Amino acid sequence: MAVLDVLIYPDENLAKVCQPVETVDAELNTFIDNMFDTMYEHEGIGLAAPQVNVLKRVITIDIEGDKTNQIVLINPEILESSGETGIEEGCLSIPGCRALVPRKEKLTVKALNREGQTFTLEADGLLAICIQHEIDHLNGVLFVDHISQLKRQRIKEKMLKLKKQIERAK
């Protein structure tokens, strides 16, 4: 397996809407394995394909981080949502920054699994928040799009400095 490069905000591909997956095959499953490897390497609990520069509707999640409850959502769609909640969210594409984001407390999601079969998942708490965060990525939305323009600009400046440091280190 491989650890993939994670795009850093404000990379323009993070703002693009992803295309649905047409075929679930061995190549996609290898990519999903690489997404999990990348997510664990960066100590994340969720990762969306556009974060690794693949504009497809694929999400990997493991809120426990122990590799026993891995969730794959291909072409996810929120069917129902209720309640209000929110936590300070972070993002692998915006390292070191967090912000309070309003989210729905409970969700029902329909998606394809790794075998290409349709399933529904009921989620609440942190899992529901994570699913919403990752689906936002598929729609070209980042958590900074939910906060004030001033805070967003400060984070953007911080990330541009970080990107320059990373480039110099290569």
From Swiss-Prot:
It catalyses: N-terminal N-formyl-L-methionyl-[peptide] + H2O = N-terminal L-methionyl-[peptide] + formate. It comes from the Bacteria. GO terms for biological process: co-translational protein modification; translation. Fe cation binds at C91, H133, H137. The keyword Transcription regulation does not apply. GO terms for molecular function: metal ion binding; peptide deformylase activity. The active site is at E134. HAMAP family: Pep_deformylase (MF_00163). This is Peptide deformylase. It comes from Glaesserella parasuis serovar 5 (strain SH0165). The lineage of its organism: Bacteria, Pseudomonadati, Pseudomonadota, Gammaproteobacteria, Pasteurellales.
